[in-house]
Design a protein with these regions (language model features):
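N-terminal Rossmann-like NAD(P) cofactor-binding subdomain of oxidoreductases
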Residues: 1-193, 208, 226
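Oxyanion-binding "anion nests"
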Residues: 193-227
């Protein structure tokens, strides 16, 4: 059996990597569509030996397509994911929008694959934060043997999590360290990121935690306790 697959946000770093993985793993695809915003319309992306031209997300008809892999921000997901789901297309969302929705399963296949059957409520499956996904794979067998009460974890995350702007800022600052004439102050991050570690991802909450820290707690509980 093969599937008709849509990749939403195909011109972004994550969207391009999704296309690469689908090809590398020889996912059974009958037809594939690459979608992007109007400003990226017509941009070409690679899919194996093929080149795909991006279509306009705003005008795309999801009817008749089996699944849509969303690799865009929460705002675009909020607008278009329900339309895709209503058209009968299973949405797999990489943003944080649906992660905490009680009617949307938050899936890490190695941990709670059976929870996927709950996706019929909204036709949407959520993908967790990358740090959460790695952590719960290690925690699950321990939790099964002896219920975990507390976890102390440190994560060190790449600037790619901040998108292309984060990657560009790291590159520019790294160059400026070796060529001080071309010194560029931070704009994407609160401090210099080159050769540095900043204990600040996303916004600070009233509790004093960052939203990234809160995400890991909430997502871990939802994934491990989904059974």
């Amino acid at each position: 059996m093969s599937y008709k697959v849509v990749v939403v946000g195909a011109t972004g770093n994550v969207g391009r990597e999704i296309l690469n993985i689908l090809d590398e793993r020889e996912f059974p695809i009958a037809e594939i569509a690459a979608l992007a915003s109007r400003k990226s319309l017509g941009t070409e992306v690679s899919f194996g030996d093929k080149t795909l031209k991006t279509n306009d997300l705003a005008s795309f008809d999801f009817a008749g397509w089996d699944m849509a892999l969303f690799a865009v921000g929460s705002e675009a997901t909020k607008e278009y994911a329900p339309k895709a789901a209503a058209a009968g297309c299973i949405v797999i969302d990489n943003s944080s929008l649906y992660r905490y929705d009680p009617e949307v399963p938050l899936i890490v296949p190695e941990v709670n694959a059976d929870a996927i059957f709950e996706c019929h409520k909204k036709n949407i499956i959520a993908n967790p934060n990358c740090s959460t996904a790695q952590m719960v794979v290690a925690l699950k067998p321990l939790h099964d043997r002896a219920k975990i009460k507390r976890v102390v974890v440190s994560t060190y995350q790449s600037v790619s999590g901040a998108g292309k702007e984060g990657i560009d800022e790291l590159w520019d600052q790294t160059k400026s360290i070796y060529n001080p004439v071309d010194n560029k102050p931070p704009t994407k991050f609160t401090k210099q990121i080159a050769f540095n570690v900043i204990p600040h991802i996303d916004v600070f909450l009233d509790s004093g935690d960052t939203k990234e820290e809160w995400k890991m707690v909430a997502e871990t509980k939802k994934i491990i306790d989904s059974e």
